[in-house]
Amino acid sequence: MRHQLRIPLLSKPADQRKALLRGLTTQLIREGRVTTTKARAKALRNEAERMISLAKEGSLASRRRAIGYIYDKKLVHSLFEKAKERYGDREGGYTRIVRTVSRKGDNAQMAIIELV
């Protein structure tokens, strides 16, 4: 029995789910906003906030953890440079989820997740 799931399973095996979240996190940090389904946006929020918290910490160990998760090494360096000045006074809540219209093909609930 799996009690208290921390992230939704998103109807994918573990390796595909991790790759999906890594890709979405990389895209969110690069672009600043991502349009995806509501369930994926909620799962992405945890990962993105974890990466920004690592960037605020700024230690070598946290930088290495971020490089191991985010696909683009240059993106990690730019995140670590900008995170303290952008989110220095904020203790969490670095992202915002805004619901949008449902997807036309399958009527899935869509959302825009963006960095605050």
From Swiss-Prot:
Q: Name one Pfam family in it.
A: Ribosomal_L17
Specify the superkingdom: Bacteria
Q: Which PANTHER family match?
A: LARGE RIBOSOMAL SUBUNIT PROTEIN BL17M, RIBOSOMAL PROTEIN L17
Gene Ontology process terms (BP):
translation
**What does UniProt give as GO cellular component?**
cytosolic large ribosomal subunit
Q: How does it assemble?
A: Part of the 50S ribosomal subunit. Contacts protein L32.
What protein family does this chain belong to? Belongs to the bacterial ribosomal protein bL17 family.
Q: Which UniProt keywords apply?
A: Ribonucleoprotein, Ribosomal protein
Provide the GO MF annotations for this entry: structural constituent of ribosome
Regions that span the bilayer: none
Protein name per UniProt? Large ribosomal subunit protein bL17
Please tell me the species this chain comes from: Prochlorococcus marinus (strain AS9601)
